[in-house]
């Protein structure tokens, strides 16, 4: 890229990458800082996330970046980590560089600070100076650029810092104040509501019992056997109901007998009507015969039995 210079210092074991005054140094003699840098505004991968953070309240902006492959890490040892996000035929490891990258002169490891910064570089890039660029971390007072190689890295960039630092960098959402004072729940309203419901239920039950008692009293007045006993000894409700059932059975049987008698009465009335008609016919025949006898000169003597 234009305006970038890569200077390798083999004797001191450090490599510096300069970009318009921005310098990144590595303390590990086997590590290499990559010089292929892209602008943050034209970053190729939209999923890349980065966080700005000043060191100790200063004006410098420091990037802490780690590239992690999508695959699962295996075969880890102290100081190195294996990346499994590359093709099966290519196995790569990462060298861990511990220290803060602040300026060109400050290249020593700071292990006694309040927090430790880690930056991971692929091993194949640290073995040779002319290797394929993968990641770079630069620090500058006014402008800082972060680049990514477009060749082998398939993982995402992750910022390693505490959750408090991440939350401090973002915008905090203000919570609306409570418009009314908070009152803790108490058992008073619930108890009052339960008492009111219980009282209403008791009132409904009382009215229902009163209606049943009134109906039983009416039955005791209708039934002949209970009318006198209820006034003297106070007939029980069960006795009144049992006698009412017996009385209803008797009434049903009486109704059946009455219906049968009515049918017999109807039959008798029909028979009586037939007999009356026959009597009328006989009277007419008798009168006709008497008329014929008189016409022929036969005297008719009617004898009556007299004692």
From Swiss-Prot:
InterPro entries: bHLH_dom (IPR011598), HLH_DNA-bd_sf (IPR036638), USF (IPR051732). Efficient DNA binding requires dimerization with another bHLH protein. Binds DNA as a homodimer or a heterodimer. Residues 104-131, 168-207 are annotated as: Disordered. Residues 122-131 have a biased composition (Low complexity). It is found in: Nucleus. Residues 268-289 are annotated as: Leucine-zipper. GO terms for biological process: positive regulation of transcription by RNA polymerase II. Keywords: DNA-binding, Nucleus, Transcription, Transcription regulation. Residues 196-251 form the bHLH domain. May act as a regulator of transcription factor IIIA (TFIIIA) gene expression. Its main location: nucleus. SUPFAM superfamilies: HLH, helix-loop-helix DNA-binding domain. This is Upstream stimulatory factor 1. The lineage of its organism: Eukaryota, Metazoa, Chordata, Craniata, Vertebrata. One of its GO terms (cellular component) is nucleus. The keyword Cytoplasm does not apply.
């Amino acid at each position: 890229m234009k305006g970038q210079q890569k200077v390798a210092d083999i004797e001191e074991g450090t490599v510096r990458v300069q970009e318009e005054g921005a310098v990144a140094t590595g303390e590990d003699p086997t590590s290499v800082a990559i010089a292929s840098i892209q602008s943050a505004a034209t970053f190729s991968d939209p999923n890349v996330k980065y966080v700005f953070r000043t060191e100790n309240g200063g004006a410098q902006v420091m990037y802490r970046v780690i590239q992690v492959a999508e695959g699962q890490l295996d075969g880890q040892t102290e100081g190195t980590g294996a990346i499994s996000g590359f093709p099966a035929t290519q196995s790569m490891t990462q060298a861990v560089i511990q220290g803060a990258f602040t300026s060109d002169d400050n290249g020593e490891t700071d292990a006694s600070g309040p927090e430790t910064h880690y930056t991971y570089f692929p091993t194949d890039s640290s073995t040779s100076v002319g290797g394929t660029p993968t990641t770079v971390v630069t620090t500058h007072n006014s402008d800082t650029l972060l680049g990514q190689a477009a060749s082998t890295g398939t993982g995402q960039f992750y910022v390693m810092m505490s959750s408090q630092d991440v939350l401090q960098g973002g915008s905090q959402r203000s919570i609306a104040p409570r418009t009314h004072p908070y009152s803790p729940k108490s058992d008073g309203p619930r108890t009052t509501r339960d008492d009111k419901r219980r009282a209403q239920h008791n009132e409904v039950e009382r009215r229902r019992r009163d209606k049943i008692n009134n109906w039983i009293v009416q039955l005791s007045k209708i039934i002949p056997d209970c009318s006198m006993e209820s006034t003297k000894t106070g007939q029980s409700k069960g006795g009144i109901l049992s006698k009412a059932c017996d009385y209803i059975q008797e009434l049903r049987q009486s109704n059946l007998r009455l219906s049968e008698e009515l049918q017999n009465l109807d039959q008798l009335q029909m028979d009586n009507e037939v007999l009356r008609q026959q009597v009328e016919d006989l009277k007419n025949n008798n009168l006709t015969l008497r008329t014929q006898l008189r016409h022929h000169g036969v005297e008719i003597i009617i004898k009556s039995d007299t004692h």
